[in-house]
């Protein structure tokens, strides 16, 4: 027998909706571990650092002072 015989399930992290794409209220934009992307306008953070839309609109990514922000613009 071997000591290496195990693996964890993938957590399906990453960007779910990309820039300039439409999103509905409550739609998930990014699943992440920690705040790699920070919430901008009309975006909120879930308890597992998931970013989701507070309003309907188009997703916009921007970098300000070396920080990545995600916003939802009408």
Swiss-Prot record:
Gene source species: Pleurochrysis haptonemofera
Signal peptide: none
InterPro entries, sorted: Ribosomal_bL27 (IPR001684), Ribosomal_bL27_CS (IPR018261)
Gene name of the encoded protein: rpl27
Main location: plastid
Alphabetized SUPFAM superfamilies for the sequence: Ribosomal L27 protein-like
Places the protein is found: Plastid, Chloroplast
One term of GO molecular function: structural constituent of ribosome
Name of protein: Large ribosomal subunit protein bL27c
Domain of life: Eukaryota
